[in-house]
């Protein structure tokens, strides 16, 4: 009986901590400006004390290196200026306008599942010779829900599903 309750308890802990997932639909609008430069976009998660715990995505112009990365001001202060090669795994080229899907498995940058609780999802966009948009929204890992963020200039509407 003790063994069965231990197994059940372990299964519950694993399901809360290990199965957390975010599905993000991020819209990048088509802007009628010349010259048009695709925006740099960063998406990351912070714990309740605002310490970065996971970088979900970083889209930048690969041939430009980090030249314009500092324009992602919040990301640069929190992660970018001190980041090394560890963000290479989530770094990719800038994207064309349209809807883009992102998923996060609920793990930190070291691959460890984060415990259920309160976190902050950050989404920032900045465009060379353009504008800058930033969203910060509270999410609760371990509690399912849907979040909608309104459109801004550089970022269209964003849909977040916490699983």
Question: Where do the protein language model's features map onto the residues?
Answer:
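Hydrophobic h-region of N-terminal signal peptides that target proteins for export
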Residues: 10-18
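Contiguous segments within soluble domain cores/interaction surfaces
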Residues: 28-100, 125
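Sec-dependent signal peptide recognition
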Residues: 1-9
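Short edge beta-strand/strand-turn motifs with a hydrophobic/aromatic core
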Residues: 102-106
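Short beta-turn/strand-loop junction motif enriched in small, turn-promoting residues
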Residues: 29-31, 107-111
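A short tyrosine-centered beta-strand micro-motif
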Residues: 100, 114-124
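Short acidic/polar inter-strand loop motif in beta-rich domains
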Residues: 93-97, 109-112, 126-134
């Amino acid at each position: 009986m003790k063994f069965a309750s231990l197994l059940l308890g372990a299964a519950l802990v694993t399901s809360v901590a290990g199965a957390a997932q975010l599905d993000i639909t991020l819209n990048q609008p088509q802007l009628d400006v010349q010259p048009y430069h695709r925006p740099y976009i960063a998406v990351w998660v912070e714990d309740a004390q605002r310490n970065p715990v996971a970088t979900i995505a970083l889209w930048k112009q690969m041939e430009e290196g980090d030249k314009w990365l500092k324009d992602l001001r919040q990301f640069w202060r929190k992660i970018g200026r001190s980041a090394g090669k560890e963000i290479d795994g989530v770094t990719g080229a800038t994207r064309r306008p349209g809807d883009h899907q992102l998923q996060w498995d609920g793990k930190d940058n070291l691959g460890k599942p984060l415990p259920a609780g309160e976190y902050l999802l950050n989404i920032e966009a900045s465009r060379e010779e353009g504008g800058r948009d930033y969203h910060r929204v509270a999410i609760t890992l371990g509690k399912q829900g849907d979040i909608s963020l309104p459109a801004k200039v550089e970022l269209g509407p964003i849909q977040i599903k916490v699983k």
